[in-house]
Structure formats: C-alpha cells, structure tokens
C-alpha cells in the first residue's frame, strides 16, 4: 500500500456543464446549500491543522467545477503558500479558465488537468449536455491559455464512452506528439450513471493502447505520475499518454489518496463508503483539532482494508451518488 499523502478537495458540487458520465440527464441533483459548504476558513483550518500534520502533502482542487468557487484564486494562493504543500493541482472543465489562467499560476498553481472528451465540437457539446450552446471553442481557448502561461504538466482528461467518442482515440492521442501535453484516457465507470453505463459499457485501456500501438508504436514513458495512470509514450513525442483503468485493471493497492467533499465529508475510497467522516459537522460542533486529527489518523490506518473490500466494486457496484457529488 502506498503512503497516503494526496487529498482531493472538492470546492463546490455545482458545475456549468452536465457531462453524461458525471451528472447524467434525468438524475435529480440536490445541490449543497451555500451554508453547508465548507467556508474558506474551515477548509484552510482542516488543511493546515488536520491534514498536513497527519502527512498529507499533495492537494488537488476539484468540483463540480472548482472555478465556480468564489475567490478561488485567493484559496489557491493560501494553500500554495503553506510551506508543507509539496504539490498543488486542479482539475477543471476549462470553460472559465482562459481569463484567470495567469492569476492561478501567479497564485502558486503549477499543474492542471482539463477535461477534453472530444475534438469534435458537436460531440463535445453532446457529452457535456450544452443544449445547443456551443462550448468547445471556449474550452480549447482555456487549454491554449494554460499552455501559454506555462502549466507543466498540462494534462487532458478523456473519458472514453463507447459509441460516442471512442472513434477519436488516435486524434486525441496525437495531441501528445508536438506539445508536452499529457493525454489521459479514463475508462467509463458506473458511478451515478447506471442507465447510461448499462447501455454502453466500457472500452478497456488495453484495447486503446493497441489502437495507438498499431498506428505509431508505444513505449513505456520515463516519467511516472503520482496517481493511478499507467504512462506510455508515442516514440518521439514530447508528451505522454496515460491510461486509468479502474474497470479492467484494479489499482487499489497503489491508491495514495482520500477525498474531501465540498460539504466536508472525508472519504477514504471512491468505491466504498465505509469509514467516511463528517469533518464539517465535527468542526462546527466544537470537536477539537486534536480529536479530528486522531479520527483521520485512524481512517488512514484502516484504509487498506477499506480499499480491499471495494476493489471489485468497479465492475459490479451500483452507485446512487454522482461523480460531481463525490468530488471526482
């Protein structure tokens, strides 16, 4: 079991997109009321006084869409300025990124993941549920802005949906050839989208790699990330290709992360709700910082057992919560 030192922090559960795999059409979404969200002060207290003292050093800001969080640049700056913060990154859909990319970089954000599920504007809008409002170009502008500012690595996340965007694998992989961009293919997962998943299923990373290997060849990359991706490279390419295979290749034994939801629930496992802690309620009811630390330490100690119990759930489980409610 890897050392667990990576915390994914959901800043908000709301999003300006409604992607099929994250917030499926027809599903009832009960958004968190503003007063139920962790405040900036509460979030920083938990990071600085609870998570860092028990060993967390890497933080990723997620959503929903994190750029919808008021004062997000200030929050980035506050976390980045903590001397114990070794790595601060963000996952965003990129729609609001272009105007504030430089501000985020100046505040201390250095790594960014941007969702790009298609290079075809029509298919892209279909996936994100734009209802006729074109969104692709503004996302692409956000990607270009992040590249100009100097985010490194700049990662592009692609959720592969059979019959929707799986024919674009080679075109998306080609983005890694001329720029130091890291394209990551993510297997479609049945979390909060059981009807869509049951209708379409998923494409394994092995199949995707074979397509790319047949076109260009494929080698193991010299650079390895801190997460679950298996990293490869097209020979001669500047960037890399990552494959996140939560459906076909269990990586629970490599898990190094926990998730903090926007309303303060600490979740040790994406697939298993065992042991989750309501830190916000505890904090607001006067539970001491020392007690909160000890609760998190205990959860860290039992996380391997929780992971083991959840390892087969990716292919057999049914989940009522959407990815946006979990925090991605």
Curated annotation (Swiss-Prot):
Where does the chain bind S-adenosyl-L-methionine? 21, 64, 115, 189
Which SUPFAM superfamilies has this protein been placed in?
A: Radical SAM enzymes (SSF102114)
Pathway this chain belongs to: Cofactor biosynthesis; molybdopterin biosynthesis
Q: Which reaction does it catalyse?
A: GTP + AH2 + S-adenosyl-L-methionine = (8S)-3',8-cyclo-7,8-dihydroguanosine 5'-triphosphate + 5'-deoxyadenosine + L-methionine + A + H(+)
Q: Where does [4Fe-4S] cluster 1 bind?
A: 15, 19, 22
Instruction: Return one GO MF term.
Output: 4 iron, 4 sulfur cluster binding
Q: What is its EC number?
A: 4.1.99.22
Supply the alphabetized keyword list. 4Fe-4S, GTP-binding, Iron, Iron-sulfur, Lyase, Metal-binding, Molybdenum cofactor biosynthesis, Nucleotide-binding, S-adenosyl-L-methionine
**Binding of [4Fe-4S] cluster 2, residues:** 252, 255, 269
- Organism superkingdom: Bacteria
Q: Is RNA-binding one of the keywords UniProt gives this record?
A: no
Q: What class of enzyme is it?
A: lyase
One Gene Ontology term from the biological process aspect of the record: Mo-molybdopterin cofactor biosynthetic process
Q: What residues does the Radical SAM core domain cover?
A: 1-229
Q: Which cofactor does it need?
A: [4Fe-4S] cluster
- According to the record, the segments passing through the membrane are none
Biological role: Catalyzes the cyclization of GTP to (8S)-3',8-cyclo-7,8-dihydroguanosine 5'-triphosphate.
UniProt similarity note: Belongs to the radical SAM superfamily. MoaA family.
Report the HAMAP family cross-referenced here.
MoaA_B (MF_01225_B)
Enumerate the PANTHER family for this protein.
Answer: MOLYBDENUM COFACTOR BIOSYNTHESIS PROTEIN 1, MOLYBDOPTERIN COFACTOR SYNTHESIS PROTEIN A
Its assembly, as annotated, is: Monomer and homodimer.
UniProt-recorded name of the protein = GTP 3',8-cyclase
Tell me the gene name: moaA
